[in-house]
Curated annotation (Swiss-Prot):
This is Transcription elongation factor GreA. Pfam families: GreA_GreB, GreA_GreB_N. It comes from Hamiltonella defensa subsp. Acyrthosiphon pisum (strain 5AT). GO terms for biological process: DNA-templated transcription elongation; regulation of DNA-templated transcription elongation. It comes from the Bacteria. Belongs to the GreA/GreB family. PANTHER family: TRANSCRIPTION ELONGATION FACTOR GREA. Gene3D superfamilies: Transcription elongation factor, GreA/GreB, C-terminal domain, Transcription elongation factor, GreA/GreB, N-terminal domain. Necessary for efficient RNA polymerase transcription elongation past template-encoded arresting sites. The arresting sites in DNA have the property of trapping a certain fraction of elongating RNA polymerases that pass through, resulting in locked ternary complexes. Cleavage of the nascent transcript by cleavage factors such as GreA or GreB allows the resumption of elongation from the new 3'terminus. GreA releases sequences of 2 to 3 nucleotides. One of its GO terms (molecular function) is DNA binding. The lineage of its organism: Bacteria, Pseudomonadati, Pseudomonadota, Gammaproteobacteria, Enterobacterales. Keywords: DNA-binding, Transcription, Transcription regulation. InterPro entries: GreA/GreB_C_sf, TF_GreA/GreB_CS, Tscrpt_elong_fac_GreA, Tscrpt_elong_fac_GreA/B, Tscrpt_elong_fac_GreA/B_C, Tscrpt_elong_fac_GreA/B_fam, Tscrpt_elong_fac_GreA/B_N, Tscrpt_elong_fac_GreA/B_N_sf.
């Protein structure tokens, strides 16, 4: 598996979720399975089957997070000499040249992306179009709705 780019905040968020799954959810599910077993016949025990299904989802998510963290390339943009260039982890202020709308995006890893919070995946069309550009450059982004031009107004690394 290739390395997965991730911010410090994104890695910490995954570690917190992993800790919650292992120390809170997993014991709850084990207790639910034990309680359901006490009800007798497992073939027709809906509580038992629901708990086992939940256990499968929990264990699958634990494995997924552990795999991502083991392949994570944690990037701290504050320690990179970047000289105003848009890179992974940067917070970019852009101006849509057609609508004159300003937007601020932070380029993050796939697990951290949340478009409603203006956190865009490094693999998104917008991020791919902005990366390696600098202040005052115009990036042409190819979207399903057509081309959008963004002028880069500011780049921060925090």
């Amino acid at each position: 598996m290739t390395q997965i780019p991730m911010t410090l905040r994104g890695a910490e968020k995954l570690r917190e979720e992993l800790q919650h799954l292992k120390s809170v959810l997993r014991p709850q599910i084990i207790a639910a399975i034990a309680e359901a077993r006490e009800h007798g016949d497992l073939k027709e025990n809906a509580e038992y089957h629901a708990a086992r299904e939940q256990q499968g989802f929990c264990e699958g998510r634990i494995q997924e997070i552990e795999s991502k963290l083991s392949h994570a390339q944690i990037i701290d943009v504050t320690k990179i000499a970047n000289k105003g260039i848009v890179i992974f982890g940067a917070t970019v202020t852009v101006l849509n040249t057609h609508s004159e709308e300003k937007k601020i995006y932070q380029i993050v890893g796939d697990d951290e992306a949340n478009f409603k919070k203006d956190l865009i995946s490094v693999n998104s069309p917008i991020a791919r179009g902005l990366i390696a550009k600098k202040i005052s450059d115009v990036a042409v982004i190819h979207t399903p709705g057509g081309e959008v031009e963004y002028e880069i107004l500011d780049v921060k690394y925090c």
